[in-house]
A protein has these predicted regions:
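Conserved donor-binding/catalytic core segment of Leloir-type glycosyltransferases
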Residues: 6-23, 29-33, 40-41
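Nucleotide-activated donor-binding/catalytic signature segment of Leloir-type glycosyltransferases, i.e.
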Residues: 50-66
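Short acidic/histidine- and often glycine-rich active-site loop of Leloir-type glycosyltransferases
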Residues: 51, 92, 106-116, 120-121
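Short alpha-helical donor nucleotide-sugar binding micro-motif in glycosyltransferases
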Residues: 62, 70-75
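Aromatic "clamp/platform" in nucleotide-sugar-dependent glycosyltransferases that forms part
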Residues: 83
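Short hydrophobic beta-strand element within catalytic cores of glycosyltransferases
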Residues: 100-103
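Conserved acidic donor-binding segment of nucleotide-sugar-dependent glycosyltransferases
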Residues: 115-126, 134-139
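A charged, aromatic-enriched C-terminal amphipathic alpha-helix characteristic of glycosyltransferases
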Residues: 141-169
């Protein structure tokens, strides 16, 4: 299978990165427990691995980039319930792959995702569950396409370098 080839799969929610306090594996687990019919995948590993107890969670362990991309391509929703973020590259990459993105209401996430326009910004466990259920029930319209277009328009290297240039030129 080519690393970007989509294959038939059950509805899948994924995240990737170190399983640590910042990434909020406890909340990830609670969300999975509320949606037992949905497959959850955590691409990565870490010291908080034991927090992921729900039977519908698969932990891949550390994966090379090609394997991680294969998991991501064959998933439907990117879930990022972090306690804090900077500018999460995994979120930008997921938007580029046209995934429905469900994220916590923290700086970084909410700077990129405009709730119900190009993804979902969540405050409560119930918000996450409802957002994922909307995605599963295909009640998201062209949200993934809007996220993809946001990446092309706002987060490409040309636009970002122009923004940095403006910052430097306007410094007093």
């Amino acid at each position: 299978m080519d690393k970007t080839e989509k294959v038939e799969h059950p509805f899948t929610v994924f995240t990737l990165g170190r399983i640590c306090y910042q990434k909020n594996p406890t909340l990830f687990n609670e969300i999975a427990e509320k949606l037992p019919e949905i497959r959850f995948v955590w691409i990565g590993d870490g010291e908080f691995r034991e927090e992921l107890k729900s039977k519908n969670i698969e932990i891949t362990g550390w994966a090379d980039r090609a394997t991680a991309i294969r998991y991501a391509v064959n998933a439907d929703v990117f879930l990022l319930p972090s306690r804090w973020e900077g500018l999460p590259i995994s979120l930008l990459e997921s938007m580029y792959m046209k995934k429905i993105c469900v994220v916590s209401n923290v700086i970084g996430n909410r700077d990129v995702i405009k709730s119900r326009l190009n993804g979902f910004v969540c405050d409560t466990l119930e918000d996450y569950v409802q957002a994922i259920q909307c995605a599963k029930d295909n009640k998201v319209g062209n949200m993934a396409e809007k996220a993809y277009l946001n990446i092309l328009e706002q987060f490409n290297t040309r636009v970002m370098s122009m923004e940095y240039q403006n910052i430097y030129e306007n410094r007093q």
